[in-house]
């Protein structure tokens, strides 16, 4: 924890990543798992990040214990990464102001890239605005370019607590406009989504999101 708080996060900030989110699994598969969210302004920033950290003497010193861990006492088991492109309808991260934060990370898989693009269109045209109107507060929406279970899209919502989560989703599901949208030909669940998974996350004390 100390290496992430004192070494990695400041180093990413120096490398141009404005906000670093660090989350622990509250409910979901593969627990215990640590989730880290990094936002970049360009693909060049993504490509240069590793070299920038490697050249950052302050990071190398502050994170020495983590970086120089031995095979008999590793700092982690494995790392899995995904690269996402922000939706046009929400190009920037919306950092929540609330003190108590429960995050829900949701992934929608599709049977084809065409279906995946239709689901993204559905969000862009209708769902994002319905989310906001019914009390669901998005943090980001991303089209997964590189990762597992492709093609898919992933988004994150934030709530003050479980009660707010349940209330927000109930309001969304009951919304007349949403009922109309989800029944439109070409946009029904059967046509655009083949699997939905979610995980609940709590931010680490030092998370910037």
Where do the protein language model's features map onto the residues?
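Short S/T/G/P-rich N-terminal loop/turn motif that feeds into the first structured element of a domain
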Residues: 1-60, 65-180, 185-209
């Amino acid at each position: 924890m100390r290496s992430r708080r004192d070494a990695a996060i400041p180093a990413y900030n120096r490398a141009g990543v404005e906000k670093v989110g660090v989350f622990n699994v509250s409910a979901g598969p593969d627990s215990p798992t640590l989730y880290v969210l990094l936002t970049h302004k360009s693909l060049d920033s993504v490509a240069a990040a590793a070299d920038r950290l490697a050249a950052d003497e302050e990071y190398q010193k502050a994170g020495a214990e983590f970086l120089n861990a031995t095979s008999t006492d590793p700092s982690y088991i494995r790392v899995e990464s995904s690269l996402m492109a922000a939706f046009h309808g929400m190009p920037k991260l919306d950092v929540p102001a609330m003190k108590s934060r429960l995050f829900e990370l949701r992934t929608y898989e599709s049977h084809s890239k065409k279906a995946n693009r239709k689901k993204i269109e559905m969000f862009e045209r209708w769902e994002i605005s319905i989310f906001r109107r019914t009390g669901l507060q998005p943090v980001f929406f991303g089209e997964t370019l590189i990762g597992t279970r492709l093609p898919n899209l992933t988004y994150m919502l934030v709530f003050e607590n479980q009660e707010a989560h349940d209330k927000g989703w109930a309001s969304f599901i009951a919304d007349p406009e949403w009922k109309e949208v989800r029944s439109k030909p070409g946009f029904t669940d059967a046509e655009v989504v083949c699997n939905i998974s979610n995980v609940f996350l709590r931010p680490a004390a030092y998370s910037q999101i």
